[in-house]
From Swiss-Prot:
Name listed for the protein in its UniProt record: Uncharacterized protein YxkF
Pfam entry (one): HTH_30
GO biological process: positive regulation of DNA-templated transcription
Gene3D superfamilies referenced in this protein's UniProt entry, alphabetically: PucR C-terminal helix-turn-helix domain
GO molecular function, one term: DNA-binding transcription factor activity
Organism for this UniProt entry: Bacillus subtilis (strain 168)
Gene name of the encoded protein: yxkF
Lineage of the organism: Bacteria, Bacillati, Bacillota, Bacilli, Bacillales
């Protein structure tokens, strides 16, 4: 983006779709940013070059092809529109990227037959989008997304990658959660290109290795706020449980709690956070979040 700003000094870079009269707008997937360039500063040949690595973005065209529900979500995510009023339950985003001869109708129908609950597909680009789903007991798991990916590949001859996000409270912060998960998904595609369905737990070890210290601390602090908020006792409980190799009996004894009481707390944490701390990858993620939260007190 810096190099483009140097070439086109009248340009504006923003996190939201920015449509200005007399300007062309493009979206940079790698940085998750929009750039609006004055038409007076760019030639037709340069437009073609930019279109080879940036996605043309036009709010009118984007919205005219979408359903009312999809329009509401697109507006909320990219133009600071209001959160759709019907959203009352915790909500998650399942990000996807299609490859091959893409047929949106076929993809939508396949997802509709597979998905056990109601959802909205929001197309962000020609080959990318997000499935918006409210929380229910029938929510698709990682393995089920992998099964769907295999069906699409065998029956429709195009492949897909998924990033299964976590469930969040239905408020304005959903916009921020979407952007953060989209960045995780782009990172996952570079680091785990052959994996059809990924989660935050799966990419976290790679983030540990490749993310700058300050950015990693910020990332972990944000996750800690989501998981624990001001519940320091819950954080201590989860940390001790992991340190005791997920042994409920031993952890309960050290905390002077009844085993069933501790088991209930752990199960509720897993349900609320979407992180299975009984698994190795889930425990690793939660433990580092606990350590960061502890050190920042």
């Amino acid at each position: 983006m810096k190099s483009l700003l140097a070439i086109y000094p009248g340009s504006i870079v923003s996190e939201e779709l920015c449509i200005r009269e007399g300007c062309l707008c493009f979206f940079d997937e790698s940085n998750q940013r929009y750039i609006s360039i004055p038409k007076t500063e760019i030639s037709e040949k340069e437009v073609l070059v930019l279109q080879s690595f940036l996605t043309p973005a036009d709010e009118g065209n984007q919205l005219s092809m979408k359903s009312p529900e999809e329009n509401k979500w697109f507006s909320f995510l990219f133009s600071r529109g209001e959160l759709p009023a019907y959203i009352k339950k915790r909500t998650r985003f399942v990000h996807f990227h299609l490859f091959g001869k893409i047929e949106r109708t076929s993809f939508t129908e396949a997802v509709r037959h597979f998905w056990p609950v109601s959802f909205v597909i929001v197309w962000i680009h020609e080959d990318r989008g997000v499935i918006v789903e409210q929380e229910s007991e029938a929510a698709a798991e990682k393995d089920e997304l992998e099964s769907l990916a295999k069906v699409l590949e065998s029956d429709f001859y195009f492949s897909v990658r998924f990033y299964a996000g976590r469930f969040y409270e239905p408020d304005e912060c959903l916009r921020k959660h979407y952007a953060r998960e989209q960045a995780y998904f782009l990172f996952a595609e570079k680091r785990l290109p052959q994996v059809q369905s990924v989660t935050f737990e799966m990419i976290f070890p790679f983030l540990l290795l490749e993310t700058e210290k300050e950015k990693l601390e910020t990332l972990l602090s944000e996750e800690a706020e989501l998981l624990f908020g001001s519940e320091s006792e819950l954080r201590k409980t989860i940390k001790l449980f992991i340190e005791n190799n997920s042994n409920v009996t031993l952890t309960a004894k050290k905390l002077h709690l009844h085993r069933n009481s501790l088991q209930y707390r752990i199960d509720k944490f897993i349900e609320r956070s979407g992180i299975d701390i009984k698994s190795y990858k889930g425990a690793l993620l939660a433990y580092f979040i606990c350590l960061q939260n502890e050190s920042s007190e």
